[in-house]
A protein has these predicted regions:
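Residues lining hydrophobic/aromatic ligand-binding pockets adjacent to catalytic sites
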Residues: 2-124
Length: 124
């Protein structure tokens, strides 16, 4: 019988696109559908742009980064992510053992989709 190794949970950091520095190491993945305004490609030095893992345009527009809609947004986004298990696996495979550096543009670091996405990526 083959001995299956338990997969360890990935190490994930989130960082705003406007705050990233050359010294920020890891598998750099932009997790927004839209490119961050005013940011040059060279600045982010991306390994991947995972548009599919970002909230749908409809959900993003509905949410509008309104903290009062946060609870409902989380549930709706989790429902969208349930359909994206293949995209999740691809990202984790691509990152390998590297720390995943999730890059986003939102101003609010507490009420944005990367909070939900991080949990989704860490689930077994």
């Amino acid at each position: 019988m083959a001995n299956k190794k338990a997969k360890k949970k990935p190490t994930i950091r989130t960082i705003r696109a406007y705050d990233i520095e050359d010294s920020d190491e890891g598998y750099r993945v932009l997790v927004d559908r839209l490119w961050p305004r005013g940011v040059k490609k060279e600045t982010l030095q991306l390994d991947e742009w995972a548009k599919d893992l970002a909230p749908s345009s409809e959900l993003r527009k509905w949410f509008g980064h309104d903290p009062e809609k946060w609870e409902v947004f989380q549930e709706r986004y989790k429902d969208e992510l349930k359909e994206l298990k293949e995209a999740r696996r691809e990202l984790l495979d691509n990152a390998g053992d590297q720390t995943i550096l999730m890059i986003y543009a939102a101003k609010d670091g507490e009420h944005n989709h990367t909070v939900v996405l991080e949990d989704f990526l860490k689930q077994g």
